[in-house]
Swiss-Prot record:
GO terms for biological process: translation. Pfam families: Ribosomal_L32e (PF01655). The lineage of its organism: Archaea, Methanobacteriati, Methanobacteriota, Thermococci, Thermococcales. GO terms for cellular component: cytosolic large ribosomal subunit. The gene is rpl32e. This is Large ribosomal subunit protein eL32. Keywords: Ribonucleoprotein, Ribosomal protein. GO terms for molecular function: structural constituent of ribosome. SMART domains: Ribosomal_L32e (SM01393). Belongs to the eukaryotic ribosomal protein eL32 family. Residues 37-48 have a biased composition (Basic and acidic residues). It comes from the Archaea. The keyword DNA damage does not apply. Residues 37-65 are annotated as: Disordered.
Amino acid sequence: MNEKVRLLKIRAKIKRKKPKFLRQEWWRFPKFKNDPKWRKPKGTDSKMRVKLKGKARSPSIGWSSPKAVRGLHPSGYEEVLVYNVKDLELIDSKRQAARIAATVGKKKRIMIIERARELGIKVLNAR
């Protein structure tokens, strides 16, 4: 458990330093600016592909978080999407936490939260 907390702190530190990886010339075209996603530069004369100083950074393995905590919630729990009360029975309260789906209504949401409290399961978006 102590190792997991240490790795989560390392991951938070890495994420703070990590730049936004935007595609080459994202500033030039509105369709790139409004939908910012990474695309690898493939041009033969591309300064970004050659990794010249002053050009935007490219994603590489060094920016990744530790494998043991990759994909976990910042609290250290693995997120499980819950649609009904029956889904709560499948959750291991020591390593997993529930996230109530967006499509669940108010009445069922209250039932899920009450049952989670009985089972000792953490709900990430209880409101």
